[in-house]
Design a protein with these regions (language model features):
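Conserved beta-strand segments of alpha/beta enzyme cores
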Residues: 206, 279, 310, 403, ...
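Residue-level recognition of short loop/turn positions
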Residues: 143, 315-317, 381, 458
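Conserved S/T- and glycine-rich ATP-binding loop of Class I adenylate-forming
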Residues: 85, 139-142, 183, 235, ...
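Carboxylate/His-rich catalytic cores and anion/metal-binding grooves
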Residues: 167-190, 194-196
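Nucleotide 5′-phosphate-binding alpha/beta core
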Residues: 1-138, 145-176, 231-236, 251-252, ...
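Conserved adenylate-forming
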Residues: 2-5, 188-307, 389
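AMP-binding/adenylate-forming catalytic core of the ANL superfamily
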Residues: 235, 335-442
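Conserved AMP-binding/adenylate-forming
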Residues: 264, 268-356, 375
């Protein structure tokens, strides 16, 4: 076919400003393949020439900015960032008293949490922010109701140099180019956004977010043929999705698997490594913070990955715990211009080690990370149901908190705390929507509990629990 047939349209250039005819051809090939899954979205990196320069500079700083850090006050560049943002970010000006000496009084700054993003995001966006490039991400909802997180294309694209850096630490040095698929993000959900695109930072190589739910494919054999045809260089996904991929025996030979979103068990990690004969790199990341750490190649915890993020372990009062003592992982900094973070409590716990690591990376390590445990649900018919799918159903109702549990016999129980009174939530409608997701055979009880969480420390609930075990 003539190259002119692959000239990008105006809409393509809006989504992918640097796309070339080869990129158009790649997207068309992925999208129109006879075994392609059901696509329901179109997306691009929105990266322009200035963004690409900034991404390459960020990649260089990932290598050169890895100086050893000490417990106590943050490095000077973090203090400079906070000082620069204080008059422009309402939340910062409220938290940092005038005249506070941050080098010696850092712990006097009040911490922030997920709740600040949920109900007061307008206090976090700088007053002078240029909103022309604003995009909004919705968190997966693995810890409860999803958050709406303001984001920027350049900040989102920084994931790519960080992924490349982590791959390099495992001896993998990819040479991405047009015409190849660099990465596929594997999901196993009842419904999720799915699309193919190309990424400018990776030289126009292909990328796809794919749902391996069998109902999303033309035939039972289609995912096997599709993965074999496009042979992605590496894969990303959560442990639940990789476990399901392994169960489906999809023939793929990735250079690495990068797991994220929920905790990866040692048993599943070993089985994935044996099955796919490649490194399994556990990745600690939140939508609000971006990537925080990657698993040390020598097995010594998680190295803090980005140089522009300051990580603490703090107690309930916001005081730093001693090195190697357990505390809540709390972060400051990042590169999202629409969501600067100041002592943001992640809700995850671990111990910080500032000592030298045998792998050679000088950045601090998070030891014994207590992240989000993987939770698996099954429909009565046997299909997998991801907690994200349940979140998508429940977010349509006026709820403050919820606890959803599936028993070993596949029956379910849901307790909810409504925003208003007990009559503000229609239990019958909740049951109908859950049956639409799980199937009409689902046995489920819904209980309205206006004081759910009140008797627990911090008012926290456990949104998802399951008596089913993730296959390892």
């Amino acid at each position: 076919m003539k190259p002119s047939l692959f000239q990008p349209t105006e809409e393509m250039l809006r989504r992918n400003p640097l796309i070339k005819p080869g990129g158009v051809k790649m997207i068309k090939r992925m999208r129109e393949h006879p075994d392609a899954p059901r696509w329901n979205h179109e997306a691009g990196d929105r990266v322009g020439r200035e963004d690409l320069k900034a991404l390459k500079a960020f990649e260089a700083r990932l290598r050169t900015g890895r100086a050893r850090r000490k417990p106590g006050a943050p490095p000077p560049e973090i203090i400079q960032m906070v000082n620069a943002l204080r008059p422009r970010v309402l939340s910062f000006s409220e938290r940092v008293p005038s005249g506070l000496g941050m080098e010696g009084e850092w712990e006097k700054i009040a911490t922030m949490s997920r709740e600040d993003v949920r109900i007061g995001v307008e206090k976090l966006v700088p007053l002078d922010a240029d909103l022309d490039q604003l995009i909004v991400y919705k968190t997966a909802g693995t810890t409860g109701h999803p958050l709406l997180v303001p984001h920027h294309p350049r900040a989102a694209a920084c994931y790519q140099p960080m992924l490349t850096f982590a791959l390099g630490k495992y001896g993998i040095r990819p040479r991405f180019r047009r015409g190849m698929v660099a990465c596929m993000l594997v999901c196993a959900q009842a419904q999720t956004v799915a699309y193919p695109t190309v990424l400018s930072f990776w030289n126009g190589a292909g990328f796809a977010k794919i749902n391996i739910n069998p109902s999303e494919w033309p035939t039972p054999e289609s995912p096997h043929r599709y993965f074999k045809e496009f042979s992605p260089f590496f894969l990303t996904g959560d442990p639940i999705s990789f476990s399901e991929m392994m169960k489906m025996k999809i023939p793929v030979k990735p250079a690495a698997l990068v797991t994220t979103a929920v905790a990866l068990s040692t048993g599943l990690k070993k089985r994935l490594e044996k099955t796919y004969r490649c490194p399994v790199i556990d990745w600690y990341s939140l939508t609000e913070t971006g990537p925080i750490g990657y698993a040390c190649p020598k097995g010594h915890g998680y190295h803090v990955l980005p140089h522009d993020l300051y990580v603490e372990a703090v107690d309930e009062e916001g005081r730093q715990v001693k090195a190697r003592e357990r505390g809540e992982i709390t972060v400051t900094g990042g590169r999202n211009p629409f969501l600067p973070l100041l002592r943001y409590r992640t809700g995850d716990w671990g111990r910080l080690d500032f000592g030298r690591c045998p792998c050679g990376d000088s950045m601090p390590r998070i030891l014994d990370l207590e992240g989000r445990a993987p939770v698996l649900f099954r429909a009565p018919g046997g299909s997998i149901i991801n907690p994200v799918d349940v979140s998508r159903v429940l977010r349509e109702f006026p709820l403050v908190q919820h606890e959803f549990r599936q028993k070993a016999d596949l029956s379910c129980e849901l307790e909810v705390r409504p925003i208003a009174g007990p009559d503000s939530v229609d239990s019958g409608k909740v049951i109908r929507e859950l049956k639409n997701l799980f199937g009409p055979e689902l046995k489920v009880k819904v209980r309205i509990k206006p004081r759910l969480g009140d008797r627990r420390r911090g008012g926290k609930t456990i949104p998802y629990q399951s008596d089913l075990l993730l296959e390892e």
